[in-house]
Amino acid sequence: MKYKNKSPPPNTKFVKYKNNYDELNKESYMKLTNTLLSTGALVALGLGMTLTTTTVHADSVTSTAHESIYHLTTKDGWSNDLQTIAWNSKGNYYDLYFLHSKTSDDPNEAGDQNWYHTTTKDFVHFTPQNEAIKADGPEAPYTWTSAWTGTVLVNNGQIAGVPKGAQVAYFSGLEKHDGGSQNIWGAWSSDNGKTFSHVLNGASPVIDHSWNFTSHNKVDERDPSVVYWHGKMLMYVAEGNEIGVYQSHDGIHCSKADPHGASKVGMGTYLRGINTQDSTPVECPALRTMKMPNGKTKQVLFFGAKAPHAGQTTGTYYIVGHLDQNGLFAPETDAKRLDQGSDYYGANFSGSSNLAEASRAIKSMGWVGNWSYTANGIHNDESANSAFTKHLGSYSVARNLELGNDMSIKSTPIVGQGKEVKHYNSVSKDHPINGINASSNRPFTNGRDTNGTIYNLLDVPSLSVNKLYNLHFYNTKSSYRGRIYIDIWQGNDYVRLNYDPSNGLYNVKTRSGELDRGRNGQAASSYYYDGLLGNGNGYIADSGVKNQHSVDLKVLTDKNSVEFFFPNGQSYTVARFNTNQKQDFKIFTEDPTNGNKVDVTQANLSQN
């Protein structure tokens, strides 16, 4: 994907959850809100913060102001969607491709987007980036002027005019000579996937939006996912509220996969079980075959979407099922979020492009961003006085994805060896860890919530932002009772988690001054702050982890992101935009049984 306009189009407008609960299950909405968002919790955790602020003014496309420390970040300009995570058998590494623009202060300017490429063997260390597909195609009647999202796969011998074993990229883009219509092109590589300079089909599209069997709305024709299936190639293409499905025997000439039907996967199929009102557009589809522990194999359809009337902003979803006789996806489950956070989008996946080959585990990474604020101008200071940054674009840590026998996916983060490891064991309300260098154990409280007083457990300021936290919460008497609160502050910006282990529900709230006075005024800043609950309340999600004697949470922080991982493999990713290299990390809890404790392990992470 991406939008050629300076702001997301009108059909990406989100409706505030708080104003639309009457259109949802009212009982469920009220239960969620009343359970997690008591007045005490919303007020208490904003008190007693030790804040550090740094003003940074950076205006270079290679500025380090918004550069992550251990997450993959574009070397310059702007980046968003991942294209493919493909194993390179010749080089013994993974090829990664992602969308790139010249500058992040206006990343959606038509004609600016190209592909960047890097490689990795361990998803911790990445090689220097290079341009893989140029923003402008070769001069031809129907060439492209901006390269958007697509797929890379190895030619198995059936793609016409391409050497067997060569990598081939299928990608969407904007047509150069007709004002920017969306179509699909192809190109192949003669340097083992580093660049794609040999264009297929005379630089004419292999899928054209204007054909009578392609996009019904004659606008959206992007993000092709190409796989091998039963001796032919299938292409899944994002087409507004549908996914078009096409077949080809030579990789150039395409037709409907279902010759007697519309050959579309509709919203009621790929978002089965979720309220689909205001959920267009679908983007970035990807098909993989995965094997469950019981030996059975299933096709998994991943895609980007949103479900505002289910309380979900844009994110990455998956649904499990199989392909029918024509290659159209048939669901066997309801759709689920792969990551429950607001900023895991434009994701892609390893695994075989041959659907006959099943993977027990695949790897995934997502763009840390949200089109409702990330592309609308980010300042380099909390007071939002600087010019918009010209360098922005980071990705989540890679995750191992495994499909369980219940047809749910478990996500496990891949991180490097931590350094400067510190352990704090048996931390309790009576023996907390506080102060600079963890030098104090003076207890204090921080207001009240549903289950009583909120107690401090850990409050250590001015730590480096590149941290791994392993948090083992437990109760010495029974199941863990009482809320768990994690507050992470960069200057005056924050990410705050409020988790209830008794029912598994949690709330995440955020604030970033760098989003103020954006290209669309305060709209982007307000969306980041309000979420879909409104009034600064962010989002509510269900972790599925409840009534446990102990709970293990993993928290990964870097300059541009925070990632929470629950023990059942559920995750929540959120972007942040402060340029400060330091953060304050705080843990609070209720303790109605007088038995709650936490063991804390923290370490620094880097790409070195």
Predicted segments, located by residue:
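Low-complexity intrinsically disordered segments
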Residues: 6-9, 30, 50
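Bacterial N-terminal signal peptides that target proteins for export
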Residues: 27-40
